[in-house]
Amino acid sequence: NLIQFGNMIQCANKGSRPTRHYMDYGCYCGWGGSGTPVDELDRCCKVHDDCYGEAEKKGCYPKLTLYSWDCTGNVPICSPKAECKDFVCACDAEAAKCFAKATYNDANWNIDTKTRCK
């Protein structure tokens, strides 16, 4: 679920920005998403959005699905349980790891999505 996803982001990005800084970033980080991602971090969010879309096609509710996971050495690791839980956990874990590798550009936070996300 979204709270667990936030915790995974903190796991993979120890000592970095608060999770809320990722909620209104670029064209895809946060609610909705459209256009071309503005950078690598925004591409991570688009891939995550697409993964949630695939989960929904499988009949899962990714924003609400609770799953089991651990943070080991700044790496989120999913604990296998059931199909939806595993799929959603993998979406979140991969996105959190992607965030850890991507550069955060302050200029892409809280952008005008109407003009920049076409």
From Swiss-Prot:
It catalyses: a 1,2-diacyl-sn-glycero-3-phosphocholine + H2O = a 1-acyl-sn-glycero-3-phosphocholine + a fatty acid + H(+). Its cofactor is Ca(2+). It is an enzyme of class 3 (hydrolase). The keyword Glycoprotein does not apply. Disulfide bonds join 11-71, 27-117, 29-45, 44-98, 51-91, 60-84, 78-89. Expressed by the venom gland. GO terms for cellular component: extracellular region. This is Acidic phospholipase A2 PA-3. It comes from Pseudechis australis.
